[in-house]
From Swiss-Prot:
Subunit field text: Part of the 50S ribosomal subunit. Forms a cluster with proteins L14 and L19.
Region (Disordered): 116-149
Annotated GO MF terms: rRNA binding; structural constituent of ribosome
Biological processes, Gene Ontology terms: translation
InterPro entries in the cross-refs: Ribosomal_uL3, Ribosomal_uL3_bac/org-type, Ribosomal_uL3_CS, Transl_B-barrel_sf
CC per GO annotation: cytosolic large ribosomal subunit
Record keywords: Ribonucleoprotein, Ribosomal protein, RNA-binding, rRNA-binding
Stated role: One of the primary rRNA binding proteins, it binds directly near the 3'-end of the 23S rRNA, where it nucleates assembly of the 50S subunit.
Organism field: Shouchella clausii (strain KSM-K16)
The protein, known as: Large ribosomal subunit protein uL3
Family under the similarity heading: Belongs to the universal ribosomal protein uL3 family.
Amino acid sequence: MTKGILGRKIGMTQVFAENGEVIPVTVIEAEPNIVLQKKTVESDGYEAIQIGFADAKKPNKPATGHAAKAETAPKRFIKEIRGVNLDEVEVGQAINVTTFAAGDLVDVTGTSKGKGFQGAIKRHNQSRGPMSHGSRYHRRPGSMGPVAPNRVFKGKALPGRMGGEQITMQNLEIVRVDEERNLLLVKGNVPGAKKSYVTVQSAVKA
């Protein structure tokens, strides 16, 4: 069954394996999540649990009422986790980092850093033109396509807004679980800026 928890990206550091190997890790702070709702096929058409992380500062009345059913404070970051055995969880139950163990493979979903308006070279990894004297083509997008269609086809790599998108990194290994400080140490990097919210779930392709 799927396991999942919400957390906050703290940053990156490195730890040493028993054989002395240096492992770069991302530290994710995952304070106990609260189960806010259980969704069933009868009432919602599918099965899932809704979990919340981090108390909201200025909740509205609907959010307050929804959280009150779980006897908790309104949450700022709320997500649904599918594929969970509903018999094993109850509304108001806390989910902590011990859900996972060292060696587990997980998928981490976050929002990538916003880069603003960027050109085709940075945004689409295009090659630039020659920078030598006489060249009139340096960092431009290149050909817009053939003349005959009288238009630019969809999908043409052009400048535009970059980043700020939901991205999932798959099959990342959990190196260490720190129950005392509610920390998950995940091998490699995960999307998002420091202090951004991330979702950690069991790997789909593991």
